[in-house]
Amino acid sequence: MKVLKIIGKVFGFIILAIITLILATYGIIAYQTSRTQIDYQDEITEYSEKYNVDPILTASIVKVESDFDNDAKSHQGAQGLMQLLDETARHSAEVVGIDYYPEKLNDIDYNLNLGVGYYNYLYNYYNNRKLALAAYNGGVGNVDKWIKQGIIDKNNPDISKIPFDETRQYVTKVEATYDVYKTFYKDSLPDNNTLTNLEQLSYNNFM
């Protein structure tokens, strides 16, 4: 009986530790997200509606990609709010049917038009948010290969099985940010004239 009690206590401690870790992780993400002002709400909403994408998801992608810094540029040369590489942006311009101007990748409207349009193209291709996000970061060719090789289930993708560390972490971050934003913003973003700090929104939603 003593052995069973000890095992029960150890098991209970492990479960408690796991729950605590999950809550702590969510809390850290929520806190970090709440400290960030969300910018360009009107523009994000405009192009999200144009391409039938959840604006909360678009904001989550922008948050992870550039932290709402329109001048952001990665070491690989990705630019703007949605961190578009030249090749990706050029392809997206063809997809959405506009002329391509590489010098405009830091233009807010142009970048969002291409970025949200490209995500919509990926979502329509895979019919799955997680796969579309994985392709946005890791490339369509790689995601198709993982599906073909049976690494990723097209109908029920498991993020933890994504082979690329960067892509796996990227999808995880966007999904986590989306969950946090969805909690506070519900189904739409406030306009640019509204105070958008999540600490204020959390007060309004939960009081």
What are these regions (language model features)?
Residues K9-G27:
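Hydrophobic membrane-insertion alpha-helices, especially the h-region
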Residues M1-I6:
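N-terminal Lys/Arg-rich, disordered targeting/topogenic segments
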Residues L23-M207:
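Catalytic glycan-binding domains that act on GlcNAc-containing polysaccharides
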